[in-house]
Amino acid sequence: MTEREQEKAYLHWLYRTAGVGSRGFMRRMEQAGTAREIYEMARAGILEDRLDVRYKEKAQKLQVAARTEDVTGEYERMRERGISLLTLQDAAYPRKLAAVRDAPYVLYYAGRLPEEERGAIALIGTRKCSAYGRAMAGEFGAALAEAGILIVSGMARGIDGIGQWAALQAGGYSLGVFGCGVDICYPSENMPLYERLLAEGGVCSEYPPGTAPRAALFPPRNRIISGLCDGVLVIEAKERSGTLITVDMALEQGREVYALPGRATDALSVGCNRLIRQGAALVTSPEEVLEELQAEPTRSASAAVCVQQSLFLPEGLPGELLKLLDYTPKPLELLQEAYREAYKTPVTVSGLCHGLLQLCAAGYAGQTAGAYYLTGVRHT
């Protein structure tokens, strides 16, 4: 193990033992030197005498750990699991993130980190999204990724996870930023996305492996999401959405903010509409975001959806029904009437339901409150 890797081993020990944050860590470094020197003082039982009284409890904890733990062995086991550690001094540390105030001194990651020369967008929004929000997250995630834009988000339920899945489905790159250790899939229902991020993209966190998700860890995480990106795109957000925390941090960091407009009566768009009123860039298509980033679209968003669907375009009644769907949920009565007008022949309710259920099972369509809509991205 090189001298640099040995220092990282002691850093890892320090982080997982004391739970050191960015500011606290820098104070300790200024007072006590390197992580290895802190370890040596802890092992000798003199650390609490060298640090500020505010850190006495942590110092005592470190002194106990220094006498009992295998520092280098623990670090090597972490590396064997495919988890790496970077510091602000490493050339591989993301430059965009390094430039922001209070960038995390240590960054754990698995998979691949984003390519610095490519544009990056944080695609974020509410967890309990509407059918329209799901569709837009999929459409923007796929189209931006196809144009070479990196999609960064928190792998949360709803908008975040849908946009990241769409980016991977389109053959692009996505990075998940966690409010827990990178070895923990949270929420657990997103395990398929987590596994794909590890294989085709990456995940990162300032918290050491094994750190369980807690509510207090997620707001600080948001500064990393925005810090890694050129801009933040808000798909849907309620009035008091946690998404707006990321927006505030993005503005502090000098990042661009984009928002999709929504209906005035839509509670899930109150946050977006307010952002637009306050100066966020209104966008209605991926091409508008690409124009802001000065990136060339590879195809239109609607074309991206069509190409994905044409690979496995269903035949017969399901295929005919697919052409009648869009991102606004439609009840059975409306679809039955639209089918009769489009194909000049009636369809029974049972036949209609059977065809729609086939589309839902294949991932082409979704259902909400008895109405059906186009998902835009097949989750297969």
Where are these predicted regions, by residue range?
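Glycine-biased, small-residue-rich flexible motifs in mid-sequence functional cores and linkers
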Residues: 2-5, 87-380
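Short, small/acidic-rich helices and loops at N termini and domain boundaries
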Residues: 1-92, 362, 367-380
